[in-house]
């Protein structure tokens, strides 16, 4: 496989080289023809200035130069034709038997109309100064709407909205009661209720409630009085009997059986 690929590549490059050689030879031949035509034209000018004495020879030289100049001029014309760019012309296809022709013509007309609308300067020149402008103004997009008179202002009477009740259930007795709002003034700095302090509690005056509370509770005035009462109660509950007397009785019974 590798050998066949190499052979095909060699053949391809060999053909390419041959084409290049042919092009070079054609160029050399055209250059030689151009040089020959230039020499023939100079020889013809010299024969015309020589006189009538050399009759046949200048004529022969002239014909030879003309013959040499012929192929050179032809090669020049061929090279000029090759150098010039050829514009491709689209061939018009006959759509007479089909419906496609009508569609194509309509699309071409639409394109022309769009171009005219986009280029107002060209239409102005073609229409004699005012044709395109009239066409644009006559379009449906340039129709001016009639000016409408402003409507009379409508007077709206605001109806009082009913008071919105909250969703909280209230008994009928509580519904009629109205909360009295106390006037909120500046805070009293020197009042003990709003700004209590330790000094105000030290100067506390005894009231009737305090006296009643003192009657229900026992006020302790001595530190060791409570402890003495507890120690006396514990001393009364002491058991002075011998707890091991039962064991002595058991020992005596065992000794009797022995």
Swiss-Prot record:
Residues 65-74 have a biased composition (Low complexity). It comes from Homo sapiens. The modification Phosphotyrosine is found at residues 95, 190, 244. The modification Phosphothreonine is found at residues 4, 182. One of its GO terms (cellular component) is cytoplasm. Residues 1-234 are annotated as: Disordered. Belongs to the CDV3 family. It is found in: Cytoplasm. Residues 191-202 have a biased composition (Polar residues). The modification N-acetylalanine is found at residue 2. Disulfide bonds: none annotated. Keywords: Acetylation, Cytoplasm, Phosphoprotein. This is Protein CDV3 homolog. Residues 36-64 have a biased composition (Gly residues). Expression levels correlate with those of HER-2/neu in breast cancer cells. The gene is CDV3. Residues 1-15, 203-231 have a biased composition (Basic and acidic residues). Pfam families: CDV3 (PF15359). The lineage of its organism: Eukaryota, Metazoa, Chordata, Craniata, Vertebrata. InterPro entries: CDV3 (IPR026806). The modification Phosphoserine is found at residues 8, 106-107. Its main location: cytoplasm.
């Amino acid at each position: 496989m590798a050998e066949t690929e190499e052979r095909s590549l060699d053949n391809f490059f060999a053909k390419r080289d041959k084409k290049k050689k042919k092009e070079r030879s054609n160029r050399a031949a055209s250059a030689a023809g151009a040089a020959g035509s230039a020499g023939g034209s100079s020889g013809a000018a010299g024969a015309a200035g020589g006189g009538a004495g050399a009759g046949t020879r200048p004529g022969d030289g002239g014909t030879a130069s003309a013959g040499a100049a012929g192929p050179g001029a032809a090669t020049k014309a061929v090279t000029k034709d090759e150098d010039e760019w050829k514009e491709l012309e689209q061939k018009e296809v006959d759509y007479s038997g089909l419906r496609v022709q009508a569609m194509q013509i309509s699309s071409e007309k639409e394109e022309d109309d769009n171009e005219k609308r986009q280029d107002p300067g060209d239409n102005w020149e073609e229409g004699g100064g005012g044709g395109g402008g009239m066409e644009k103004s006559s379009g449906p997009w340039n129709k001016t709407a009639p000016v409408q008179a402003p409507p009379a202002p409508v007077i709206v009477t605001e109806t009082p909205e009913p008071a919105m009740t909250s969703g909280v259930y209230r008994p009928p007795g509580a519904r009629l009661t109205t909360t009295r709002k106390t006037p909120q003034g500046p805070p009293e700095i020197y009042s003990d209720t709003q700004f209590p302090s330790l000094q105000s509690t030290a100067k506390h005056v005894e009231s009737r409630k305090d006296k009643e509370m003192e009657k229900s509770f026992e006020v302790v005035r001595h530190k060791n009085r409570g402890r003495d009462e507890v120690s006396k109660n514990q001393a009364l509950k002491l058991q002075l009997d011998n707890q091991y007397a039962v064991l002595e009785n058991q020992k005596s019974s065992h000794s009797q059986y022995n």
